[in-house]
Amino acid sequence: MNQPYSAMRNNIHMLGDFLGETIREAQGNEILELIESIRVLSRDSRAGDEKAREQLLDKLANISTENVLPVARAFSQFLNLTNIAEQYQTISRHHQDESLGNRSLSALFARLKAQGTPVETVIKTVEKLSIELVLTAHPTEVTRRSLVHKHVEINKCLGQLEHDDLTEAEQTKLKRRLMQLIALAWHTNEIRAARPTPVDEAKWGMAIIENSLWKAVPDFCRELNFQLEKHFDVQYEVALSPVRFSSWMGGDRDGNPFVTAEITQKVLRMNRWKAAELFLNDVSDLVEELSIVQCTPEFREKYGDHIEPYRVVVKGLRSKLQKTLTYFGELIEAKPTTVDPSEIITCDNDLWEPLYDCYQSLHACGMRIIANGSLLDCLRRIRCFGLGLSRLDIRQESSRHETAIAEITRYIGLGDYAQWTEDDKQAFLVRELSSRRPLVPTNWTPSPETQEILDTCKVVAQQPEGTISAYVISMAREASDVLAVHLLLKEAGCNYTLPVAPLFETLDDLDHSEKVMTDLFNIGWYRGVINNYQMVMIGYSDSAKDAGMLAASWAQYRAQEALVNLAEKYHIELVLFHGRGGTVGRGGAPAHAALLSQPPRSLKSGLRVTEQGEMIRFKLGLPAVAVETLNLYASAILEANLLPPPEPKQKWRDIMDKGAAISCEIYRGVVRGEPDFVPYFRSATPEQELGKLPLGSRPSKRNPNGGVESLRAIPWIFAWMQNRLMLPAWLGAGAALRQMIEQGEESTLKEMCNEWPFFSTRIGMLEMVFSKADLWLAEHYDQRLVAKELHRLGKTLRAQLSADIQTVLTLAHDGQLMADLPWIAESIALRNVYTDPLNLLQVELLQRLRSQGEVRDPQLEQALMITITGIAAGMRNTG
């Protein structure tokens, strides 16, 4: 193995030793020996030793109730430490150049230069670069914030230990600190006592910005500037902002009754308070720093004749920011405000303009090196975060808006809007949108549900333009769904046009999306207000749950392609908003590969994508890791726009059309058509028990009594990942490919693998899933937990998985899974030794708990929750 990976293994080994010492001290030798014996048996079992496997099963079947908790915690915490070591590896000083390889900005710019791409073309494309990451608190971030903080500190220690010039005393001190942190993590409860509230989730998002992104964004801009200067001898313009952040935390009310208008208002104020605090820190540093005397005559004329002109300007800003902080602090705590609102900073430009004037004056006076220090970082942050910290999306389901408008039309004697035809709805909405008189009578008292919708629209209307980034309509099916939101916002007094983004998320809705947008673009009123800008959101998780991975991904591709062509026809700037998750069943794929597999021209207006739950922590949780993530996103977007992927050949499309139809039929045949499927799913996975895990603020079901279709996409995937069958990520895909091969299409499929990024990414994602799936463990869940009469279904599914693995191997490079990403294969193999005991222990705990009926042993329940979070850490994907 090469040197960087041996360094990573050494780190994992060291962290594991420290964890062992912690356990010995806390629990005693006997427990440590039990844990070690389980680890050795698991390792031997993985290597094919049948006797070791039997001994492992026997040991875990007979484990005492008091021992289940420390054993589950030991393996779970070890997997967390492995994740930390792996995350550190990507930013290690010894590994930096290899980490991004040919996917980095540097490699892309070198390639563009070698190919003779005109500098003007590169600059123009870079100037339009737009990466908007939308942070969402999906109920998959299973690690508590108090543990995350300790994990960040462990990462810092690993970085300090890498320095070659440490004295023995310094090394000992750092190792002792590592042991302290691991001991602190061991003595901290992994599982929250209660579900987080939407406000807790918003605070978690703010903590990511404060602790990581605040530093990462200016660092990334410096990296971008450095690479532009190095390869093309140009500077990146200060006023440009390649990165923006938005959030769903406190704005996403789809299926979450706890996110109310009041909560949204509170989160918006908390964001402003936190932004004021962070900018106050920046500006206070500038007060210390900018003691310079010399400035331009223009600067002196604008800001007065002072000995230290810059200091006077930044002191004025400091005073205003202090008042802004106090003002929003009082609003959040519902105290009477002691600050005059005219004395606070409310718009970004009030902060930007004086600081940019300082920047230009310093430049003009030959002090470029000073201008390009912390002042430049502060300017970059104003452009990226602004005084709202992160913009907020509002999301609500289309039927809620329809119900609200129907209530209004019934009250004013126009009949029931919900019963009208689509044409009648559109005619009514356009008429009302074009009218100056209000629709809602002032003396009317709506139902509480409708009042909540109207109150939310009022909160949106009260915000300065730009604070709310979009109003997303989930389950959007028709043009009237979009017009309805525009009407509700108009009624609330919103005097600017907010981007209203329909979210197309089922197979039928994706196929219908072009028609919906055509209807909208043909409405004169609509074209007049959108200012040639349209955002459309593509749903990945629900479409995959509806139709299976292959059919969903092809429908997403076709919908994006059709929407890009439509927008070009109408000369409208289209931003596609991708609702991806971290898992394959929810559209997840390595960022760079996923972006290059998009249809040509679909990234012309930049990228807007959700970053969800645990992926936020893996990709953005540390400043250096966040810089890498932004580097990958930037290079992929620029590459997609400057070196676009090929248009798929007609024969490739025909194969995808056929394959998608076959795979959808197979997937739905099992998930919808198999009468025993739901009882099998409920018994073979910890789906019922997952509902007890205090993960997110949102209920896991849309309808508590429904079947699979009422289950949210996230717990659906989380449950299958636990028993290692990983069903949603592959069902239907491999079988469809097998049928194509049997029909003589093998050489075309291999051509698609080699020449079409969309298809090769799909095969790569299947390889990843198959590397993590485990037939023996999935069978073990069935044997112990599933009624005999349902065993046939599990047997059929495992046979299908086994056949699918062989099919993908036929198409994969070198005939082995993950051959082109050996370090991921290595990582999965390393984790399996620690994840397997958690799976086996989970089966044991599920069986014991289910046999106890209603009154369950709290110790066993706690241990079960830890196996769930541990397996999630081991798989590096939750939902």
UniProtKB/Swiss-Prot annotation:
Q: Which cofactor does it need?
A: Mg(2+)
Per the UniProt entry, the Enzyme Commission number(s) are 4.1.1.31
Entry-linked InterPro entries? PEP_COase, PEP_COase_bac/pln-type, PEP_COase_Lys_AS, PEPCASE_His_AS, Pyrv/PenolPyrv_kinase-like_dom
GO CC terms, sorted: cytosol
Q: Which SUPFAM superfamilies match?
A: Phosphoenolpyruvate/pyruvate domain (SSF51621)
User: rRNA processing as a keyword?
Assistant: no
- What is the active site of this protein? H138, K545
UniProt keywords (A-Z) are: Carbon dioxide fixation, Lyase, Magnesium
Question: Which biological processes are named by the entry's GO terms?
Answer: carbon fixation; oxaloacetate metabolic process; tricarboxylic acid cycle
Task: Report a single Gene Ontology molecular function.
Answer: phosphoenolpyruvate carboxylase activity
Q: Which reaction does it catalyse?
A: oxaloacetate + phosphate = phosphoenolpyruvate + hydrogencarbonate
* Keyword Cell division part of the UniProt annotation: no
The source's superkingdom equals: Bacteria
Q: What protein family does this chain belong to?
A: Belongs to the PEPCase type 1 family.
Role description: Forms oxaloacetate, a four-carbon dicarboxylic acid source for the tricarboxylic acid cycle.
Extract the HAMAP family matched here: PEPcase_type1
Q: What is this protein called?
A: Phosphoenolpyruvate carboxylase
Q: Which lineage do the record's taxonomy fields give for this organism?
A: Bacteria, Pseudomonadati, Pseudomonadota, Gammaproteobacteria, Pasteurellales
